[in-house]
């Protein structure tokens, strides 16, 4: 997937970048707390992924003319701006990283490489109804996995099962949106519209609450 920055609305934007291309970029924009976190990452690939995601969210913020506030993770593992303003979601796969920001609403984003093993793992994250229309197709299974990950990130709480609490409506390979809902979770049911972009062997999904 190519590097891109897209303004969704005056309130929201997302960015996708190549992790390796960002390797020499300055990290002076990071908060002191983030610089400490980055210094404690020892694995080279993990360092590149972490950096790539921060560079992506910086680009998204610049698109809607917002300064980089720094980010931290809560006890659910969800990232938040340190100034308490807005909502963010980060993701990476292979050599790509992506991030989305919205000034007012929760967001979720996910990048996935199309993989055969998503079919084998299907019973762990898919309802029987979903497996019927996905027809053992790795492309469709990866779309479903990514859409559910995006919804999971947007709702932002642990204890939500991809299989039991997130249900997707039928979709096709050429679908540019996927409808899904969180239900029977102990929290209020909520419907999501997940946007889908496909390029070569990579699937990008994102949603806004």
What would you call each of these model-derived segments?
Residues 1-209:
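Core catalytic alpha/beta fold that binds nucleotide/phospho-ligands
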């Amino acid at each position: 997937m190519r590097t891109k920055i897209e303004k969704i609305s005056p309130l929201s934007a997302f960015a996708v970048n190549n992790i390796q291309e960002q390797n020499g970029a300055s990290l002076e924009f990071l908060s002191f707390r983030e610089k400490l976190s980055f210094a404690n990452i020892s694995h080279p690939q993990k360092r590149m992924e972490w950096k790539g995601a921060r560079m992506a969210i910086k680009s998204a913020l610049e698109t809607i003319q917002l300064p980089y506030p720094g980010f931290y993770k809560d006890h659910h593992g969800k990232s938040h701006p340190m100034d308490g303003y807005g909502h963010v979601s980060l993701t990476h796969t292979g050599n790509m990283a992506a991030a989305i920001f919205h000034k007012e609403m929760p967001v979720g984003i996910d990048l996935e490489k199309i993989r055969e093993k998503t079919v084998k793992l299907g019973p762990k994250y898919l309802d029987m109804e979903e497996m019927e229309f996905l027809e053992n197709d790795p492309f469709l299974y990866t779309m479903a996995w990514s859409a559910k990950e995006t919804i999971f990130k947007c709702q932002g709480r642990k204890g939500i099962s991809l299989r039991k609490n997130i249900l997707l409506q039928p979709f096709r390979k050429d679908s540019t949106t996927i409808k899904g809902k969180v239900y029977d979770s102990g929290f209020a049911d909520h419907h999501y519209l997940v946007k889908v972009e496909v390029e070569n062997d990579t699937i990008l999904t994102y949603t806004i609450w």
